[in-house]
Design a protein with these regions (language model features):
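Mature catalytic domains of secreted/periplasmic carbohydrate-active enzymes
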Residues: 26-274
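Bacterial Sec-dependent N-terminal signal peptides
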Residues: 1-27
Length: 274
């Protein structure tokens, strides 16, 4: 035991000058930190404040009323006579929203233009709208106006579905369609309430259709390029700061199927252009 003690003492004494020498050469260096709170950087894409607010909605409804209600078609071709839209009473969005509120939902999306191009408000962008409806109830219909007013009255979130694809428009597939029809429609819808939480742009883009009597197939390629998404996003967010753009626009997307199957934990790992 004594031999071990002597050996350790000798080692400690022999190391002392080395440690002392190293300490005399050590000095602190000042450094400016760009991250003063020492927060770790993101590992994956992070949700924006707008996306987080959208996520808090949790459970909301989708109201698909329009020309398809009277043609009994899932997707209209765009050649439907406007007079077919002839409701026997004034549509009542407040009744719709009261029903979903009773179910515990926090809001709803109203389809105001599907792929057939028929607009449920008196738009200046096309004649394929309620302006030429088959009766007075139809011609007086303005779903964006009445849906927004009802949602605000009930304290619910609201937004609109507007299809980028337009099987009625003779301009579809051209730059003029994007500028004079689609973007104008989005701008009009934005005027129906700056507190909209979502604008839904369907992923179905291009295919066969009426197209003003051309009856052909049109493919537009990359939707983000054709619909001028940077301009669309900036224009919408300038007026609707909390409005998430679903589908075209890249802030929210479908789960990958129309049956509603999803993993227990699911978060989009892509950025706005993926």
């Amino acid at each position: 035991m004594k031999k071990i003690t002597y050996l350790l003492s000798a080692l400690a004494l022999s190391a002392a000058p080395v440690i002392s020498s190293a300490q005399s050469q050590f000095s602190l260096q000042s450094q400016t930190l760009t991250n003063s709170d020492n927060e770790p950087g993101p590992v994956f894409p992070l949700p924006t404040e707008r996306q987080l607010k959208w996520n808090e909605t949790e459970f909301y409804a989708f109201f698909h009323y329009g020309m398809n209600t009277y043609t009994n078609l899932e997707w209209g071709n765009g050649d439907e006579a406007e007079s077919i839209f002839a409701p026997t009473a004034a549509p009542n969005p407040e009744q719709w929203l009261k029903a979903v509120q009773a179910a515990g939902m926090k809001g709803g999306i109203a389809v105001v233009k599907h792929h057939d191009g028929f607009c449920l408000w008196p738009t200046s962008s096309t004649t394929h709208s309620v302006v030429k409806a088959g009766n007075a109830f139809g011609r007086e219909t303005n779903i964006p106006r009445d849906f927004a007013a009802a949602a605000q009255k009930l304290g619910l979130k609201y937004g609109f579905y507007v299809s980028p694809w337009d099987r009625n428009s003779a301009l579809y597939g051209t730059d003029k369609y994007v500028k004079d029809v689609f973007l104008r429609q989005c701008a009009e819808l934005a005027t129906y309430g700056t507190d909209q939480f979502e604008m839904w742009f369907d992923g179905a883009n291009g295919g066969d259709g009426y197209y003003g009597g051309q009856n052909k197939t049109i493919n537009v390629g990359d939707a983000n390029v054709y619909y001028d998404v940077p301009n669309l996003r900036d224009s919408v967010h300038k007026i609707l700061p909390d409005c998430v753009m679903w589908g075209v626009g890249g802030e929210a997307r479908w789960i990958g199927n129309e049956q509603g199957w999803a993993g227990e934990t699911n978060w989009c790992m892509g950025d706005g252009t993926s």
